Structure formats: C-alpha cells, structure tokens
Amino acid sequence: MTRCTRALLFVLALFMTAAGCGLAAPGGSDAEPKVTILGPWTDEQELQFKDVLNGFGIPYTYQGTAATREVLLAEVQAGNPPDIAILPGIGELVEYAAEGRLRSLRDLYEPTEYGKPWRPGAEGIRDHLWMPLKADLKSIVWYRKGEAPQLRPAPLASWCIGMGDDGASGWPGSDWIEDLILQRMGPVLYARWATGDLEWTDDRVIAAWDAWAGMLARDPDRAGRMLLADHRGPVGGHGLLLGGGCDLEHQGSFARAFYGDRSGEAAFEDSARLLPGGPYTVRAHEVSADFAALFGEGGQARELIRRLASRDAQEEWGRKGGVFSPNAAVPPKKGAVDKEVSRRFTDQRVPLCLDASDVMPAAVRDAFYEAVLLTMAHPAEPVRPKLTDIQNVQKAQKANQNGKPHPLTGVCGRPQ
C-alpha cells in the first residue's frame, strides 16, 4: 500500500466517522453488537493484535490508524466515540478524563502487576481510568550486528533519520530532544519539564536542543532530506537501518517491526554515549506505552479490556506479535535482543521515564513537533524563539483550564 493510499484511506475514515459509519471487521455476525476499538496498530501489527482479540470470542470491530488522536477527536465530536480507545498520548486521555468521558477500569486489571511509571496519575483526576497494554523501550540506538559503534557521539552522516509518518510528523525528532534532556539533566528535571513545571526557555533545555541542532547544522542538506524521509523507510523495504546508507538509528524497540524478516540482523546499544554533546552516563531510560481507556459502558467492552490485560493474553501477544508487556507478572521474553530490552524494563538501578511528548497536552505536543520540524529545516537558526513559542502555547493551555490544570504524576520511577 502506498503512502498516498494510506492518506486517502485516513480521509475516508474521517468522513465515515462523521457520518456515523462503522468499519467492517471480524469478530461476529453483522447482527451482533460489536465492541468498537480504535488503536494505533496497522498492517502486520494490526493482524497480530486481531489474532489475540479473536481468541476472546467477543464480537468486535477494530480501526487501526497512525492518526489515533485525530480520528478519536472526530468521533468524540460526532457523538460516536469508540468503546475502547488505545493511545500512546496519555496527555490526551487526561483531557478526556477531565471532561468526564472515561469510565473506570477498576477491577479489570491487577494494579500491583504494573510498577512505575506504567500507571501515571493526574492531579484532580480519579484513578483507574487508563491502563498500559503494550510497552516499548527508547533511549537506545540500533545498529547492524557485527558493526557495533564506537561509544562516542557520531556525525550526522552515520544516523538513519526520517520525520515522515501517516499521522502527526515530528515525533522521531522529539525523541532525540527528550533523550538529550533525560541524559543531560536526569529524571527529576525531565519529569518537571515533561509536566510543564520547568519552562521550555530554561537554559538547560535550550542547551540540550542546541546540541541536536548543532549536529544537524553540520550538514543542512542531509538534514533537509531526513526531514522528508519516512521514518519506516521505503514501502516494502527493511527500514532505514537495513536499507543502507546509514549505520545508526535512534529508535524505540518497535523499530524491529520496520526491519521485517531481517530484524534478526539488528542489535542495540544505550543511546547516552552516542548522543550529540556526549558521551553521557545513562541516567534513565525513556519508555513509551499504548494506554487503553474505556469510553463505552457495555459489559462486553469491559470484559474485552479485562481479557487483554490478563497475564495469559499479554504473554500470547508478546509471543505472536513480538511486543513487550508492562505487566511485571509476564515472564521475560527469550532471545538475546528481547532479553536486553526486558532487562532494562526491570533493572531497579536505572529509572524509567515515560515519553515526554506523550505526557504533554495535545496542543503543547503539536507545538513541540512543529519546533522540531522547523529546527530540521533551518538548523543554524537560534532555537530560543522556537522554544518561546512552545512556552507561550503551554501558558495558554494552562489558562484555558481555568486555573485547574491536571499535571501527570509518576512520570518517572524505578521499576518494581
């Protein structure tokens, strides 16, 4: 499927949503009421997720899109939200919770099986409104096996970078900024910045951003090509790393899905020593999760979440789909690379911190992404004006909350 075709299907999906139409999917006859699910997984990952769902015997329809935020917003505004929404952006779920749209997940999963930071709270919001279904490790750099990098900052020519996506663009660059702030400033200041307590114009934030911009500015033409490249590599290929032309990829554990049947050729190293301005000491690992929230009130939807959250389903999904579970009761996966990912998820010596842009309110995140793209397009320009613009958006966001913001808590923590 071409990128243009995907974009067309996305637009069609929005029109169908606005008209109240459903998307056909397996899981029961047309006469049966189906649990409607919106999630971020498409292509092979969608098939693997459906394979797990099909084992529950609960009729469902699944809509997979990289633009979960836009589709969910359209469905909510049309008065027809899905029963279950699965989003990486926990900040958006906080906004829906503040509007009273989310139903409690109490008794549908065992909270003690999920350590920090997998169960973040929000000030002024009741607990048990979201739960993590899938986890990914960030703060890592992929390389081809047998070609381990020297543990020092690498030039731009070594890096595999692409900003393009079917949904919001810019997040591959925001991951660089987040990782730099985390490794330079540590988890405490990182959490303050991610939740809006440390300003974007703080000198330490500017210095981290400058380190990334400085690397890009050494070869602005290459940076411009990276701005236009798709982060997954060419359609039908094996990702950016295994497609040739670069040696290192700053990408999460989900990157192996891009490498396809050649994923066994890739290994990873902690990113801290390779980041611009380093080498740094590993101070924490950035992680991400896809969180499920319940918009519907039906018993079937509640039962489906309960089944998805169970140890058996999480273990089966990991086995069939190669994904990682945030559930501490799920045994570590086998395989050298899988073991290294699992070890970092459970190493109590090194804190884990949720992806900062996922924690931020949607408007702030959008401004963050825009500033990333502008930096790639014009890397030699000063970064302070761009960060001032983000800070202004953040101030306006807080003002729109009538003095009652709901910042997330527990963004960083040591695993159990």
Regions found by a protein language model. Give the residues of each.
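Conserved N-terminal structural module of periplasmic/extracytoplasmic solute-binding proteins
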Residues: 1-92, 397-416
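Short helices/loops that flank or line small-molecule/ion binding pockets
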Residues: 69-81, 99, 153-155, 231-249, ...
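Hinge/lid segment of periplasmic solute-binding proteins
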Residues: 90-140
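Extracytoplasmic/periplasmic solute-binding protein
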Residues: 131-133, 153-201
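Glycine-centered hinge/linker elements that transmit conformational signals in sensory
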Residues: 194-232
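Extracytoplasmic/periplasmic substrate-binding proteins
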Residues: 216-297
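Mature extracytoplasmic/periplasmic domains
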Residues: 286-362
